[in-house]
Amino acid sequence: MAAFKLADRLATLPPYLFAGIDKVKAEVAARGVDIISLGIGDPDMATPGFIIEAMKEAIARPANHQYPSYVGMLAFRQEVANWYDRRFGVSLDPATEVIGLIGSKEGIAHFPFAFINPGDLVLVCTPNYPVYHIATGFAGGEVQFVPLLEENDFLPDLDAIPEDTWKRAKMIFVNYPNNPTAATAPLGFYEKLVDICRRFDVIIAHDTAYTEIYYDEDNRPPSILSVPGAKDVAIEFHSLSKTYNMTGWRVGMAVGNPTLVAGLGKIKENMDSGIFQAVQEASIVALRDGDDFCRELRGIYRQRRDTVITALHKAGIQCRVPQATFYVWARVPQGHTSADFVTRVLQETGVVVTPGNGFGTPGEGFFRISLTVDNARLEEAVSRIAKL
């Protein structure tokens, strides 16, 4: 058999975040231990019935089984624009400022190929979703990480970035509500970021997949596009995955600056064939009729969040009370690294949590809990951790 060599770009990939965890998990499971996984952020609840029924009807239409538009059906893009107007007060032209995605991950991964040339500098706020820097590397860009520190509420210190760096930078990736820290960003932060990026012609790529998982009705996470002038420099990536428990459906959208949207569309035109039209039709129903479901979903996550926070604080584990996302970002006990603590928790309790350093160097000293099992299992998981 021929010995084929992988492309050099794959040699630069960091180890898969969950590879080591999966190995230990298999060893623990082989001992007959009941595993509770609070690792990957994948909702445990079903897609709501009204969306499933819309999908059934859409599947029955023969036209939906043909090739879809690579940018998304105009009706889907129009509904995205309607939702943005209703939710954020942001006006979008569905023809030029909205594009459908096969999940936001696809769009984020493709985006650097549209605007980053070899050697271009891209700022990535970290700890972070790994796709930002991996996609940048694949496109030949140079990554400079910008730390998100607890003392700055897990926001990047924009003033600490030298002017020469801003002059060199082509793009910056930001993500709020944030994975993994669960931090939120106030409108004032976006205003400052937009001002700087307009001054230095830096593209803002904003991942905002968690805006609808929030816990304060009077302080809902904003869109960066709510800032006047943001469309000059920003594109925002969103998804139906977390909002409607649709991770497996693979549907999302990117909105904002028409040139940025068109550039991403040019990549997609040559790299994929768009979202299955039946999924788009069901997604129209989700965006149009899903507000009541989202309210109920937030109530469930709020109860789960409170269960975990109360138990962690009682056990002496430090963590902030998240105002958004379905994650809890907690400090590991003194004397442990993130990896050591997570491994010990798994080996001794059968509970899977994610080491903070897997999301970047500033994540060292933290671990992430996903609120993606029911309340009874969460109570059991945290009680096991508390006994360590």
From Swiss-Prot:
Keywords: Aminotransferase, Pyridoxal phosphate, Transferase. Its cofactor is pyridoxal 5'-phosphate. The modification N6-(pyridoxal phosphate)lysine is found at residue 242. One of its GO terms (molecular function) is pyridoxal phosphate binding. InterPro entries: Aminotransferase_I/II_large, DAP-NH2Trfase_DapL_Desulfo, DapL/ALD1, LL-DAP_aminotransferase, NHTrfase_class1_PyrdxlP-BS, PyrdxlP-dep_Trfase, PyrdxlP-dep_Trfase_major, PyrdxlP-dep_Trfase_small. PANTHER family: AMINO ACID AMINOTRANSFERASE, L-GLUTAMINE--4-(METHYLSULFANYL)-2-OXOBUTANOATE AMINOTRANSFERASE. Homodimer. This is LL-diaminopimelate aminotransferase. The lineage of its organism: Bacteria, Pseudomonadati, Thermodesulfobacteriota, Desulfovibrionia, Desulfovibrionales.
